[in-house]
């Protein structure tokens, strides 16, 4: 099992480039493009690589400041949401990292921030070290759509991860509209799995199809009896009508078969839910899978009523690129 550096790492990274997160404005990114902050892959070091502005760095890096002030970047999150925690990652920035940083946020139903926008401080100034991860829990139940990331006074940051719960106005979803109940953009999140040796369990809920094997969930080769599994919390309680299991890019390492269980969970912690999931009702009986393909199951879905969680079982192990659970919202 993967060991998380902070409990909130299991939540959706709202600042993931794959969700559409992007820089709206930045005071200075002379040495390194600020949009690199949102790349889903870990930062890398390229020895001896320089461009016209200096040493190539995998992150956001501003010039050395020769006047008063500090640098900042205004960010539009790919999906608005409630922030549970952040990771300010200064990997490979050693003599050029900012001594401190802070984070502000706002929520706009439409449009972009301007000079009249009221910002809320969600992370007061915190000290930073070079080549390090800095995990900070955020205690604020508001939903935010934009961030202002401040570094004092200048320097470089490799990655900014903003973990939280995506926000969606479910009152605007009609009773007869079929939606993906587990999509990250709709608030779905992977909460536990048996193993994620090669790829994160959260990848299977991302929009679009996977770009490669690394952009999916893949377990280690199982050398003991049993099977691998992942538990997903739906963005909203709903009734399932169709499931899509996509093994794109997985050719010699796709699962032989899969099944899905579901449950209407009321209360409990993630660890308690994990323990109980073995006894959930069968939503999708065991189905054969093939390599590098989308598998749609509709007629095979059992009518078990409204559910809040599903458990995808893969037999015996292997990789899945994406999981879609289509259905209607249950009020």
UniProtKB/Swiss-Prot annotation:
Question: What catalytic activity does the UniProt entry give for this protein?
Answer: allantoate + H2O = (S)-ureidoglycolate + urea
Q: Which GO terms describe its biological process?
A: allantoin catabolic process; purine nucleobase metabolic process
The pathway that the record names for this protein is: Nitrogen metabolism; (S)-allantoin degradation; (S)-ureidoglycolate from allantoate (aminidohydrolase route): step 1/1
**Record-level Gene Ontology MF annotations:** allantoicase activity
Which EC numbers characterise this protein's activity in its record? Answer: 3.5.3.4
One Pfam family, short name:
Allantoicase
HAMAP family according to UniProt: Allantoicase
* Name of the protein in its database record: Probable allantoicase
């Amino acid at each position: 099992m993967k060991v998380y550096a902070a409990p909130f790492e299991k939540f959706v990274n709202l600042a993931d480039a794959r969700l559409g997160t992007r820089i709206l404005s930045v005071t200075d990114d002379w040495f390194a493009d600020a949009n690199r902050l949102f790349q889903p892959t870990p930062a890398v070091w390229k020895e001896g690589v320089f461009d016209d502005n200096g040493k190539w760095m995998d992150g956001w890096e501003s010039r050395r400041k020769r006047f008063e002030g500090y640098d900042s970047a205004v960010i539009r999150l790919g999906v608005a949401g409630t922030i549970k925690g952040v990771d300010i990652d200064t990997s490979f920035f050693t003599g050029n990292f900012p001594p401190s940083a802070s984070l502000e946020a706002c929520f706009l139903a439409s449009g972009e921030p301007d000079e009249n926008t009221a910002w809320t401080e969600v992370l007061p100034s915190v000290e930073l070290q070079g080549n390090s991860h800095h995990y900070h829990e955020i205690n604020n139940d508001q939903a935010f759509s934009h961030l202002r990331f401040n570094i004092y006074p200048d320097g470089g940051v490799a990655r900014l991860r903003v973990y939280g719960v995506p926000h969606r106005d479910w009152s605007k979803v009609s009773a007869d509209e079929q939606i993906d109940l587990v999509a990250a953009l709709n608030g779905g999140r992977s909460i536990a799995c048996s193993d994620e040796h090669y790829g994160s369990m959260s990848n299977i809920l991302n929009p679009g199809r996977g770009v490669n094997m690394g952009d999916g969930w893949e377990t280690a080769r199982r050398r003991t009896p049993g099977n691998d599994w992942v538990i997903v919390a739906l963005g909203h309680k709903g009734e399932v009508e169709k499931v899509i299991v996509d093994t794109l890019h997985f050719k010699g390492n796709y699962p032989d078969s899969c099944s899905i269980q579901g449950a209407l969970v009321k209360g409990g912690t993630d660890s308690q839910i994990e323990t109980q999931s073995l006894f959930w009702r069968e939503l999708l009986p065991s189905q054969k899978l093939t390599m590098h393909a989308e598998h749609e199951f509709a007629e095979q879905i059992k009518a078990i009523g409204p559910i809040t969680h599903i458990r995808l079982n893969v037999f015996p192990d292997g990789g899945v690129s994406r999981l879609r659970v289509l259905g209607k919202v249950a009020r």
